[in-house]
Amino acid sequence: MGDYIVVLEAPIVVKDVESVEEAIEKAVNKVVSALEREKLDFVRVELGYSQCPVCGAHFESAFVVGNVGLVGIYLTLKVFNAQSLEHAERIAKAVVGKALKKVPLKLFEIKELHNGREGGGITFEEEYQG
């Protein structure tokens, strides 16, 4: 059994917006309200970022066309006592999916926690102290 940090990506559609900033604000408020209704205040909500295929620069994942906005949102949560990476992903999607019922959720990133910290191998200092 392991503990994981799971980051899910969600596309949020908002209507009647005039600008990207307004779309972002409405999308974040919509997600936070839905999570609070289900008492999921432990889920961190962040604006998603996309990468330009030409220059590689990062920009906010928010677009407005015809007063309709599409905003990419990252949802981060810790999953405890999962049997595997796939199990942690399913748990995270089930938990967040309760609040965001008709929003497709995609795994963006997942990391295993070791002793409450993100894992990823041993550092030089830890190896040297031996």
UniProtKB/Swiss-Prot annotation:
<dbReference type="InterPro" id="IPR007564">
    <property type="entry name" value="UPF0212"/>
</dbReference>
<protein>
    <recommendedName>
        <fullName>UPF0212 protein PF1486</fullName>
    </recommendedName>
</protein>
<dbReference type="Pfam" id="PF04475">
    <property type="entry name" value="DUF555"/>
</dbReference>
<comment type="similarity">
    <text>Belongs to the UPF0212 family.</text>
</comment>
